């Protein structure tokens, strides 16, 4: 909305500042943070009042969780999504279609996660929406978004998988890219969902990935920078940096309340939405493979679950003491702060590795 102040710049030259994506990204970040700081306590109190016993804790998990996390409300993703939405609506260019496509995926996945959390809390069980139903809805949302991105973009780039490290090497998948893109978005959403198991574990790597893709979006959406770095120019995607800024701000606000011992969990409401957002941005800016590097921590968590389930079904034996892998380290005696901070360090290193691909051509 504030973007429209540019129209008054002839009378008020100071309003020219709203032309700059960097300025509006900073504004979105501050707005998202302030919103969560201001309304977070009220949201937490209401969720605690309405949920009663809070998020059900796994009885087969680390026994310490039954004592330290019992009664903690979930659905904290509502705080993040509210701050993200307010920051985006206020500061992003309302005429940019990429903004609305990514925001639609984010809120759509957030709704799926919210309903899943609602089922778990009301029934006090880990069985929310059936896995098949949840995946079906996610694929419908992601597929529609990827179809829009392919239709909106410049052919053949919009329907191609770009290979990093090489100049102009890409695989044109045609409309099959819609299916591939949907897998990227759904995979990212569920990978972040699996990572969200300890206080602060998911939100910081999400913010690191968001900062990385905010930079990538800005560069890919700028013809000069894209040509210099020899990456594919995708007109209009620079505006996605504003969304990433809003997420960073809202994430910082949420971390204030999610720091151990957490006052609230983001739940599926937050983790599915944020993962879906990262996946859809990666598809929009044509850096799907780079997402697997920058979000390597999420990939590791997801792969650990896949390996654990496959191994147990095929051999009757478990590879890890418990999956996802952060619980494996808990069972090995690592403290929660050790796991969380070490995983943060890994996330930073992976983000730097992913960003380095921008120059390696």
Swiss-Prot record:
It comes from the Bacteria. It is a multi-pass membrane protein. Keywords: Cell cycle, Cell division, Cell inner membrane, Cell membrane, Cell shape, Cell wall biogenesis/degradation, Magnesium, Membrane, Metal-binding, Peptidoglycan synthesis, Transferase, Transmembrane, Transmembrane helix. Pathway: Cell wall biogenesis; peptidoglycan biosynthesis. Its EC number is 2.7.8.13. GO terms for cellular component: plasma membrane. It is found in: Cell inner membrane. Its cofactor is Mg(2+). GO terms for molecular function: metal ion binding; phospho-N-acetylmuramoyl-pentapeptide-transferase activity; UDP-N-acetylmuramoyl-L-alanyl-D-glutamyl-meso-2,6-diaminopimelyl-D-alanyl-D-alanine:undecaprenyl-phosphate transferase activity. PROSITE patterns: MRAY_1, MRAY_2. The chain crosses the membrane at residues 25-45, 72-92, 95-115, 135-155, 169-189, 200-220, 240-260, 264-284, 289-309, 338-358. It catalyses: UDP-N-acetyl-alpha-D-muramoyl-L-alanyl-gamma-D-glutamyl-meso-2,6-diaminopimeloyl-D-alanyl-D-alanine + di-trans,octa-cis-undecaprenyl phosphate = di-trans,octa-cis-undecaprenyl diphospho-N-acetyl-alpha-D-muramoyl-L-alanyl-D-glutamyl-meso-2,6-diaminopimeloyl-D-alanyl-D-alanine + UMP. One of its GO terms (biological process) is cell wall organization. Catalyzes the initial step of the lipid cycle reactions in the biosynthesis of the cell wall peptidoglycan: transfers peptidoglycan precursor phospho-MurNAc-pentapeptide from UDP-MurNAc-pentapeptide onto the lipid carrier undecaprenyl phosphate, yielding undecaprenyl-pyrophosphoryl-MurNAc-pentapeptide, known as lipid I. Belongs to the glycosyltransferase 4 family. MraY subfamily. This is Phospho-N-acetylmuramoyl-pentapeptide-transferase.
